[in-house]
Amino acid sequence: MTTTNGNGHVAVTTNGHTRPVVTVGVSARDDGNRRPQKTAERVAADIVRDLVAEGLRTGDHLPLEAAMVERYHASRASVREALRLLEVQGLIHLKPGPGGGPVVGQVDPANLARTSTLYFHLSGATYEAVLRAQAALEPICAQLAARHPSRRDAMQRFLVPAGLRTTSEYRRHTEDFHGTVYRLAGNPIMSLLTQAVTRIITDHVVATMDPVELRGAILHEHAALARAIAGGQPETAGRLMAEHLAAQHDYYRRNAPERLTELVEWR
């Protein structure tokens, strides 16, 4: 339950405990007195712009520190801080030893998920709210996927329910299927947001249980979804995805009701 006191401060009550919530939105600095951008932040932004402009990909090397100092007109300390900022976000990693240096990382939704959990926690969001976000986002991705020109070829391998025997096979199939839907959606923002939300559910909620009894139904639902997407039926695809998620969410609510009322953990 969320409450507001006379001073306008927001608090959330979960499992009988009330705690204050940091309001995420307009801050005290939004009155026209924003702090100046730090040199390291400016350098980090320039590095990202150059990374995109030059078409660098995962595993490509960035210039060495000395070259960056000259290129970005910054001190060594500012360049190092900029690289640390990017490393924390998973956008680069620093390879040690000879031939090392900054290397382009992966655009991994797990990094967005991790950062998002901090803001979700501060805003008082529960895991139930994360489920509802997924229920809103993923059917839209399915509808968009059903309009993609490459949908038939991409969905071909999912048209028949997979015969999977092990947990690892099942998880790989599930990640592959939903990942293909996200890619076919053709909207990188929708794709990243949906993948981040789904990653939080997988790592924070599903990890506490193993719904083996749902696997057969889920695999048949994937096949039905694949046929709707491949057949260019966006409304059907959206409806089937909504039903697919609703069945899983109902299972989580029955089997882990306390977990869903908890604040999203930052991790």
Language model: regions and residue ranges:
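Conserved amphipathic alpha-helical segments that form helical-bundle/coiled-coil interaction surfaces
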Residues: 130-207, 218-226, 236-251
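A broad structural signal for alpha-helix termini and local helix breaks/kinks
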Residues: 72, 185-186, 256
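…primarily DNA-binding HTH/wHTH and HhH modules…
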Residues: 257-267
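Short linear motifs at protein or domain termini
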Residues: 1-133, 147, 260
